[in-house]
A protein has these predicted regions:
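Short, small-residue-biased leader/transition segments that mark boundaries at the very start
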Residues: 1-5
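Short, positively charged interaction helices/loops
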Residues: 7-44
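Phospho-regulated, low-complexity intrinsically disordered regions of nuclear gene-regulatory
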Residues: 33-84
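Basic- and hydrophobic-enriched, low-structure N-terminal and domain-boundary segments
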Residues: 72-131, 139, 150-153, 454
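P-loop NTPase motor domains
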Residues: 101, 107, 142-379, 392-394, ...
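P-loop NTPase motor core of the ASCE superfamily
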Residues: 116, 391-469
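Conserved lysine of the Walker
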Residues: 136
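H-loop/switch region of ABC-family ATPase nucleotide-binding domains
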Residues: 385
Length: 469
């Protein structure tokens, strides 16, 4: 390639915010780092590039991969490559086995693992209840590290989306944590400094008006719920109509909060006299937390959303989580079923919501939908909250839909939750209460599925969680 061509390439790579990032382990996998280094330095020999910058290196690698893609897609090059490598069957067999090693069982020094994707597992959801100081953050880190370690060097990497309510994972002081998850600081998104690079709204281009009507009703309910708005029937109808009108004006393309507010105010008697709905919409407009279009794919990479700049129970924090869960729903509706082989199914992505109790006290339909149907598309969700009773919401039983409820140290112990979760009463109930009360930092109890099925022995096991961070 000419020098001019290479210079233009590098300029494009620098300016491309949406360029794919390649995980750090890519450069050391199969001991090929020396070869990669030599090839890159030879190709870009005339440019002054700082090769120590992971973000720059990742984008250059991505550009080279795209160049390779263009070559493979021309003529019959791809078919020739697949035939030569005999790789079609190997790709399916390469689905990683996600047996997450999270610690050991009590004093037995026996490894404690969570089977996430074998074909016998009905779902892949994990819920965690642990009070402040229970070791919940470390457990989340262990789970993320295991998902990534077991998958990133395969052809089926499992990416993640973490809502960092406390700002611990995005804290520069904890920068060394990121390498444990095979990411760097470019994965951290701070909506206080820059809008999140996604539109939260669904694309209805070419779809029926009935679909928009249904969506507008759901969206109206959500906007009222995230700030506990007391909205009259007229206000709800007005908001639904405003959403439909906004979509009509974009011919079904994703709308914005600004357009929604404008359409809503046009239906108010006095647009200068805010009601509770226009007040919420103005907060969302002023916060400018989302872009008006997708600039990156939410599931094709890993992201940490820095949330500590917003009140945890405020409308902005709730809107971020709600609308990104809704976004995941929209994405997964369009995906094919995940890859499967004789032993395991593919897990594409997992979302982690810490301080999840703030998202469980209202009818969070996108979250419920993801938990209910996510397994069929290769999605896992990890919810963490401080109190075990938070997962017993009025409209949805999160315990019944979780494969692995993990109970850590509690401030208050809910007998009803224990009865439902472990199927115990009387003396067995007291034993589990005592076990929970005696948990120390970094310890948890989990239902013993075998004892539960046989109806004999202790209905729980205690796990000492690996100390990672």
């Amino acid at each position: 390639a000419s020098d001019v061509y290479k210079r233009q390439d590098y300029k494009d790579i620098q300016l491309s915010v949406s360029s794919a990032r390649i995980i750090p382990s890519f450069f050391t996998m199969h001991d090929l780092s020396t070869l990669y280094s030599a090839l890159l330095k030879l190709r870009y020999a005339d440019l002054n590039i700082d090769w120590t910058q992971n973000a720059t290196l990742s984008r250059i690698i991505a550009a080279e991969m795209l160049r390779g893609r263009d070559y493979l897609m021309s003529d019959n090059n791809l078919d020739s490559f697949l035939y030569a490598m005999n790789n079609k069957v190997a790709m399916t067999k390469d689905i990683p086995v996600l047996n997450l090693l999270i610690g050991n069982y009590g004093d037995e020094e026996m490894e404690a693992t969570l089977d996430i994707n074998s074909r016998s597992i009905t779902n892949s959801q994990i819920i965690i209840a642990g009070a402040t100081g229970s070791g919940k953050t470390n457990l989340l880190a262990v789970l993320i590290q295991q998902f990534r370690m077991l998958s990133t060097e395969s052809q089926y990497p499992v990416n993640f989306l973490l809502f960092d309510y406390k700002g611990e994972f995005s804290d520069i002081q904890n920068n060394h944590w990121l390498s444990l998850f095979d990411v760097d600081r470019s994965c951290i998104l701070d909506p206080l400094t820059q809008p999140l690079p996604f539109t939260p709204f669904k694309d209805f281009t070419g779809r029926s008006i009935n679909e928009i009507n249904l969506y507008s009703t759901e969206m109206s309910s959500a906007l009222c719920s995230i700030d506990r708005v007391s909205a009259s029937a007229n206000m709800n109808n007005r908001l639904s109509e405003a959403i439909v009108e906004a979509y009509k004006s974009t011919n079904g393309a994703p709308i914005s909060f600004e357009l929604m507010l404008k359409c809503y105010q046009s239906r108010m008697k006095d647009a200068n006299n805010d009601d509770s709905i226009s007040s919420v919409l103005k907060q969302l407009v002023n916060a400018h937390i989302f872009e008006s279009e997708d600039k990156v794919s939410l599931i094709d990479d890993s992201y940490i959303i820095k949330m500590d700049g917003y009140p945890k129970d405020g409308p902005i924090a709730k809107a971020i989580v709600y609308f990104l869960m809704s976004k995941l729903n929209n994405i997964y509706e369009l995906l094919d079923k995940q890859a499967v082989n004789d032993e395991v199914v593919q897990i594409r992505h997992f979302s982690i919501i810490d301080e999840a109790h703030y998202m469980l006290d209202f009818d969070n339909r996108p979250l419920r939908n993801l938990i209910a149907v996510g397994r069929n598309k290769g999605l896992s969700i990890i919810l963490a909250t401080q109190n075990m009773s938070s997962f017993k919401s009025k409209g949805f039983d999160f315990y019944a839909n979780a494969q692995y409820p993990l109970i850590m140290k509690q401030q208050t112990i809910d007998d009803k939750v224990i009865k439902d979760l472990f199927g115990v009463s009387g003396q067995e109930l007291q034993e589990i209460r005592t076990a929970i009360a005696g948990l120390q930092k970094g310890e948890l109890i989990i239902k013993d599925q075998m004892a539960f099925a046989l109806g004999m022995g202790n209905k729980y096991k205690k796990i000492n969680v690996t100390h990672l961070i």
